[in-house]
């Protein structure tokens, strides 16, 4: 684990950093780099709605190509599926020997969708939290733990540069863990697919369906399997599974111990291993690329099918009753 004393902020302060993208992570990186005394410009395509916001927040903005030409450290924080085209069209033609190309996620490098020149340092600085939290912690004098990795190191100074960058966005205040592009990418994708997004979503929908099919009101099913999930996850987030079990009733704890393994059994683990293999061998990324090349048609169809599930209809109606719940733009427009 690396902390403030292990990183030299002057290294990144002596470089020119171009941040490509101004989404959740892009705005947090750009503003915190600036506040740490780093020269920074933001790269956004002409016509981007975020350009006005960048200027309002006191940052310089230009096209990705112009920023790549100006910078000697380029942090690519555009969406995964857009990065290869941005690299090919805007970044690669403007790279020079000694430049560094940074990422917030390792997918495009690990699976060979982006292949930088050998003379360019390739590294990753990945905060383990959303951008708004990264920025808020930085402003409060704290930080969010980060992962760093170096894939190409022609100068032998890649790790020091990555640590310096991590320090500039507050990461070394909390702690920085050294990893590899392979491990970060594969664990991140597996967590998303098997547990956080895919697994949890299907578990919630299955529970809802079982209750409704058994004759219970959809509203009650929604509260029991979706709404109250936040209470449980918050307890786990704060103190792990043990904290959650300590905090719930004895009835809930006992029932969970008995019934949980009936839902998630050895067969579930076998299917999880299949998901992991599909990630490791590149099958998932091939499907992801095919979807993008096909105009996102498969993704749009899957979105449509999931949006039509009864739990979404019931949930929207119930959330109208909850003044304390922040409403997404799609429900307030």
Curated annotation (Swiss-Prot):
Listed GO CC annotations: cytosol
Superkingdom field: Bacteria
Residue ranges occupied by any KARI C-terminal knotted domain in the UniProt entry: 180-325
Residues binding substrate, per UniProt: 249
Ligand binding (NADP(+)): 22-25, 45, 48, 50, 80-83, 131
Pfam families linked to this entry: KARI_C, KARI_N
Alphabetical UniProt keywords: Amino-acid biosynthesis, Branched-chain amino acid biosynthesis, Magnesium, Metal-binding, NADP, Oxidoreductase
Protein name, as recorded: Ketol-acid reductoisomerase (NADP(+))
Species of provenance: Mycolicibacterium paratuberculosis (strain ATCC BAA-968 / K-10)
